[in-house]
């Protein structure tokens, strides 16, 4: 099978790279290895939330924050990709979201500040409309609503924590729980269960009535925060309909996995690529690459019990990171799955981790060292293959978790890698 460019990955970087190639008139193939951690970590596109991992002061304007970060850290992936790639990539993504039927908002000119499921403020750049009413730059009181039998969102915890960091004379956060109509007491729900139930108009209407009764407010100046379960496939209709029924602003809050918001985002974008003519190869992880005369001539996929070779003029490795299984971790070393080079070696395996879950983890910085064109670098300091380009979390030397920059880096490097692949 021969293509212009083969994109390997299952996340936002892979999707942005594929879309960029498609819009440039190329014939890409998207090799989707399988379920990735993006279903668990993505709900918004976070470009740059904090300028360093230890500060609690959010970045107000992502464009300005990234420009300053590039000036201070010229070897950062944002610097390699370039501010122009971030700007153009975000423009590409926002236009694509609209074309694919999403209702999102945001820009590089400002960050929203949104409450998490635990009630901590979190800066985000691009968000679904269904989350916008939760912006903590507004002062209206918040009522967090949970559901009996659904344990992935604890409204009392969210209200307590948010009160400490955000509450004040004109701000308040409280919590309620309601029983869901049509179910026996003791029933346990998942996010998917609830998302499907909320697509029923009658169910929505009765839930809205119960929330009004439990909240004991007339709706004037109050907003309601719910776990993100307002529809699985028809969310653009469910959220505004439910908000009308309730008579108050409603916002969704991302919860524990599986993330309904992420399922909506990635499944719909992936489907849109297929509907517009992009070939997608499913559940076929790449396990080897053939290099001749400094160029990759083909990659090999594990597909349905057989080896499947893919040939292309260029390749974009838009893998995620060690959490997604993009790298092969042994006791003492971590290898990449294509060229089988050692990316990291630890005499003591525990050096890869920090005992504290809330501190930066060394393993998160493992990945490909790249050139200024995002080509993977070998042990000799030269590109392993001149027509291979890396995007996303597989680039070495940074951990986006603390700075809330995973989405921005995926967009910038995915877009830049696609442009380099076109020129290869």
Describe the residue ranges of each PLM region.
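A conserved FAD-binding loop/helix module that cradles the flavin
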Residues: 19, 325-332, 385-386, 393-424
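Glycine-/small-residue-rich beta->alpha transition segments that form the dinucleotide
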Residues: 34, 304-305, 312-314, 318-325, ...
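Glycine-rich FAD pyrophosphate-binding loop
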Residues: 23-43
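Glycine-rich active-site loop/strand segments that organize a redox cofactor
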Residues: 43-84
């Amino acid at each position: 099978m021969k293509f212009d460019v083969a994109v390997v990955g299952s996340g936002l970087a892979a999707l942005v790279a594929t879309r960029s190639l498609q819009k440039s008139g190329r014939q890409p193939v998207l090799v989707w290895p399988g379920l990735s951690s993006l279903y668990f970590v993505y709900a918004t596109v976070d470009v740059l939330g904090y300028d360093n991992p230890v500060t609690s002061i959010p970045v107000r304007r992502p464009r300005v924050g990234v420009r300053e970060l590039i000036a201070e850290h010229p070897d950062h992936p944002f610097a390699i990709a370039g501010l122009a790639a971030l700007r153009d990539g975000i423009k590409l993504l926002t236009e694509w979201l609209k074309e694919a039927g999403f209702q999102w908002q945001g820009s590089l000119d400002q960050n929203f500040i949104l409450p998490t499921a635990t009630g901590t403020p979190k800066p985000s750049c691009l968000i679904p409309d269904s989350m916008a009413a939760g912006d903590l730059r507004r002062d209206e009181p918040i009522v967090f609503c949970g559901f009996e039998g659904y344990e992935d969102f604890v409204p009392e915890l969210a209200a307590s924590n948010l009160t400490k960091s955000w509450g004040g004379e004109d701000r308040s956060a409280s919590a309620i729980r309601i029983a869901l109509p049509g179910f026996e007491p003791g029933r346990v729900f998942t996010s998917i269960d609830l998302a499907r139930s909320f697509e029923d108009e009658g169910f929505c209407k009765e839930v809205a009535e119960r929330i009004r009764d439990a909240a004991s407010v007339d709706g004037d100046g109050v907003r309601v925060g719910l776990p993100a379960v307002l529809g699985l496939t028809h969310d653009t209709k469910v959220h505004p309909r439910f908000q009308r029924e309730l008579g108050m602003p409603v916002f969704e809050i991302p919860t524990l996995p599986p993330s309904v918001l992420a399922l909506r985002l990635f499944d719909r974008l992936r489907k849109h690529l297929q509907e517009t003519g992009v070939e997608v190869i499913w559940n076929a992880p790449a396990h080897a690459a053939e290099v001749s005369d400094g160029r990759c001539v083909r990659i090999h996929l594990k597909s349905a019990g057989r080896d499947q070779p893919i040939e292309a003029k260029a390749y974009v490795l838009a893998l995620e990171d060690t959490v997604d299984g993009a790298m092969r971790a042994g006791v003492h070393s971590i290898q990449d799955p294509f060229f089988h080079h050692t990316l990291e070696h630890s005499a003591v395996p525990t050096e890869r981790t920090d005992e504290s879950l809330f501190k930066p983890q060394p393993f998160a910085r493992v990945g490909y060292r790249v050139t200024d064109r995002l080509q993977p670098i070998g042990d000799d300091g030269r590109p392993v293959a001149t027509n291979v380009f890396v995007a996303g979390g597989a680039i070495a030397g940074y951990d986006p978790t603390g700075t809330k920059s995973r989405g921005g880096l995926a967009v910038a490097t995915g877009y830049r890698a696609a442009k380099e692949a076109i020129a290869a």
